Structures are given as C-alpha cells and as structure tokens.
C-alpha cells in the first residue's frame, strides 16, 4: 500500500500567508489539516492522494467570522456548510450579549429567537433536547464532542449571565442586582474565560426584544445593566486580556463615549474592544467620519485597543409585510412590534389616527437610528400583484393618489408576508465603504451568519471583500492590496 507524505498537495497557486506581504507562487503540502510544507518548487504528484493545480488562483488561510449568530444552528447542524463553502474556517458565536451557556433552555431561546429572527418553534425544541449543560465547562465539553465543520469560538453573553443569576423577569426589569448577584456574575465570567471563551459580549441598544410569554417585547437583559455592573465585569476582561464586544445605543449614540473611556490604556492595560458598527448609513451620512475619528481618539490619544466592526458589502435587507425590526427605533413602530397577535397588528395600521402618528415619527429628524425611513427607497421584490415588482412605495402611491406610507400599509394589509420588499440601510457609496475597510480602527465583521435568515445573507463576506479589492485595483483606484485584503479576513481578526 502506497505511503503518502501529505494528505493534500496544492501546486502553482499564488500563496498569501495572511500577513500583508504580497503573494507569490508557492506549493503547499497539507497533513492532518495543517500546512506542513511551503515549497518554492512543485511537490510531486505521488506525494498525496489529492493533488490540485491552483494555477491562476489565490491560495489563502481560512477566513474568520468574528460576529455570527450560529448559536442554535451549530447545535443542530455542526457542519455549518454555508460558511465553510465560502472559505470560512473559524467562527465566533455568543455575539450581542446572547450565548447559550448558563441560562435555562427556554431562557436561551427567548433571548435569541426574536432578536435574531429565527423561529422559536425551531430553536426551543433543539435546546430542550440538546442543552444538558448549565455552565461554561459543560458547554465546552459539548462542542469538544461535536463533528464541527469550522473551528468554533465563543463569547459569553452578558444577557445570558444576567438571566442565569437574576432570572429572566428580574433581569429584564429596573431591579438592581445584589452584591451577591454581582459576585456571581463575576464568577460566571471567570468560568467562561477559564473554559476558553474569548471574552464577553454586551448590548446597550434597546431595539432588540425578548421572545416568549414571560418577558415578551422587553429589551434584552444587558440593556438594563448600570455602568457599575459593566465596570466590574470589564475589570475582569482587562485583567484576563479578553475581548469586550459591545453595541452602543443605536438611536441616541452618545454612550459610545463611555465605551471609549472604558477602553483606554492610560496607566493601565487597555481593554480589547470590538464595537458595532462602522457603516456608511443613509440615515446619517457623516457617521462614518465620526466612527473613524472615535477610533483614532481611542487608540492614539487614549492608548486603547478599540476597533469598529464593518461590513464589506451594501447593508441591504429583505423584508416581509410589517415584519420590520427598524420600527423599534420610534414609538409608534415599537407599538406595532409589541403586538404578538398578527391580526391585531395588521388591524392597527388600518386606524387613521395610528397612521397619522406613524407618519409623524417617520419624519422626525432626531430619532433616526439605522434606518433612513424613506419609503421611496423601499422596493417591492415579490408580490401577488406582479405589476408592483421593481417599484418603490412612493411610485406605487403616486399612481393611486396616496402618500408612500399609506401605499405601503395598504399593500401590507392586503398581502401580509406575501409582500416582500427590500431597502438599503447603508454602505451604498463604494468610496466611503473602501475608507471604512482600509481604516486601521476597523475590522471586518458584522456578517450575522445564522441570523435574520429571511432578510440578509452575508456568508460570503470575505470573498466580497477580496472582489472589491481586486475590482478597485483593476479600476486604478486601489484602497488596499490583495495581501492586505487577505490579512483583513484572516490574521488581523485572529
């Protein structure tokens, strides 16, 4: 029987090692899942049972996704094929304060399903069957036994910790945790880091709401925490050199200053911070400048280790009927989202008084968050009335003598979730997106794989980045080299 030196040989590819060094033609030998030989000359065909000719192709390290929501999917389907087939070989879960480590199965489901737009009826049975662990060591042990597709890492979610200590109802109320409860939270964070979690994720934007019957439509538990609670946990992250992944208030935004200060490294070790998110938003065209400037201040003046996550793609969402998470940004929209009964929700938008209030809030200048609230930039992509496909709600309303909001509501009432439409929140200007991607104060993330399954699909984000890099170079407008692009989705994230 023939003895092979390698499992796989890849010859003649342009090899990028993940650093910012330019690629060069190299020949790779892989054994037991690791690159063991990088040769200047081709490796022989008889050295491995699988030999690939990569002439004219790039050979790179596996890509890393630092912001996914595969927490439920990986329990049921650990292969995560959709990411792996796009070259992603390492994935982090536990983002946005939500992990499935410490809390009870129903608590974990209620924290996760509405926020990440994954059906509760799919997630809860999986957790009830599979979640036999109650702590980080058990969580780690579960994954050690799974046939994982990519490498897996996790944050521990602050909402998960809070619910495990205080219970769901108290954790989603103004109740202050006792000293004993704060000490227990600290202990759970230490245990998570001991088990291999990379850090803790938290949330301060109150747009994401809890599912289920017990705390329906309350903001995530992490949003109820006071800064004293955060600071106690931050001290542990700083001492352990672990990562804090956080999100400032998406509407008010001012609390980002507190995050900047917490990250500082003046006369102490800086806390590693990965913050959501640096986008070129239509609702705030200058926000991209503010995020880059804040990164400069945090890292240069405050000596921090602070990065904004940014997305290498237009931030376009596909939506159904009235199922619009951005409605949480203003009170009348929040009222709609609070309805658990779909019939009652659709009946509400038939109320003229409600429509008047909704239009007032849509046109308000000082409460805009992520969404631009421009219904002339909301386009029908599928509808039983096929004549509407490709038109925006303002165009549809003009034909019928209605304004855009009335046109939208009337169609939503008539067709409900059969009305599919899309809108772009941001990253619509390639030249600004390029600046965000090239900034030393951002890193590539925010793909949200495993969540919002009917709205977004950014599984291929590393490949999109590399295509933007190549296209810009071919157009004579380079914003980073191919080697820097590979670095941005590999070593820079590691």
What kind of feature is each model-predicted range?
Residues 139-143, 149-151, 155-168, 173-181, ...:
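Active-site neighborhoods of metal-dependent hydrolases
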């Amino acid at each position: 029987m023939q003895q092979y030196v390698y499992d796989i040989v890849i010859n003649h590819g342009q090899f990028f090692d993940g650093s910012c060094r330019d690629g060069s033609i190299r020949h790779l030998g892989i054994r037991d899942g690791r690159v063991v030989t990088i040769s200047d000359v081709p490796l022989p065909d008889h050295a491995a049972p699988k030999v690939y000719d990569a002439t004219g192709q790039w050979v790179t390290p596996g890509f890393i996704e630092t912001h996914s929501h595969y927490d439920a999917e990986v329990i049921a389907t650990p292969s995560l094929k959709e990411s792996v087939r796009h070259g992603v070989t390492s994935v982090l879960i536990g983002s946005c304060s939500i992990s499935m480590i410490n809390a009870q199965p129903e608590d974990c489901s209620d924290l996760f399903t509405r926020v990440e737009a994954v059906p509760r009826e799919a997630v809860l049975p999986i957790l009830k069957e599979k979640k036999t662990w109650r702590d980080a060591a058990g969580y780690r042990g579960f994954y050690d036994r799974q046939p994982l597709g990519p490498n897996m890492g996790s944050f521990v979610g602050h909402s998960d910790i809070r619910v495990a200590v205080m219970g769901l109802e108290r954790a989603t109320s103004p109740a202050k945790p006792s000293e004993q409860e704060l000490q227990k939270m600290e202990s759970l964070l230490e245990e998570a880091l001991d088990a291999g979690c990379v850090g803790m994720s938290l949330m301060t934007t109150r747009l994401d709401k809890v599912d289920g019957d017990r705390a329906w439509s309350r903001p995530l538990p992490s949003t109820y925490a006071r800064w004293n609670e955060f600071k106690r946990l931050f001290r542990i992250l700083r001492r352990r050199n672990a990562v804090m992944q956080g999100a400032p208030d998406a509407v008010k935004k001012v609390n980002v200053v507190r995050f900047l200060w917490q990250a500082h490294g003046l006369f102490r070790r800086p806390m590693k911070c990965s913050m959501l998110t640096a986008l070129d938003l239509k609702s705030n065209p200058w926000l991209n400048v503010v995020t880059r400037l804040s990164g400069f201040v945090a890292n240069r003046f405050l000596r921090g280790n602070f990065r904004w996550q940014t997305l290498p793609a237009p931030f376009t969402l596909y939506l159904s009927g009235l199922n619009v998470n951005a409605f949480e940004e203003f009170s009348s929209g929040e009222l709609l989202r609070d309805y658990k009964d779909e019939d009652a929700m659709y009946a509400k938008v038939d109320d003229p008084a409600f429509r008047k209030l909704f239009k007032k809030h849509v046109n308000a200048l000082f409460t805009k968050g992520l969404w631009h609230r421009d219904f002339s930039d909301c386009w029908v992509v599928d509808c039983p009335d096929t004549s509407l496909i490709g038109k925006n709600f303002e165009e549809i309303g003009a034909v019928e003598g209605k304004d855009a909001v009335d046109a939208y509501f009337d169609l939503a009432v008539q067709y409900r979730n059969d009305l599919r439409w899309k809108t772009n929140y941001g990253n619509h200007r390639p030249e600004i997106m390029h600046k965000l991607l090239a900034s030393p104060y951002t890193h590539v993330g925010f793909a949200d794989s495993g969540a919002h399954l009917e709205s977004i699909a950014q599984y291929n984000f590393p490949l999109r980045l590399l295509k933007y890099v190549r296209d810009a170079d071919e157009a004579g407008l380079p914003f980073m080299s191919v080697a820097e692009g590979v670095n941005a989705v590999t070593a820079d994230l590691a």
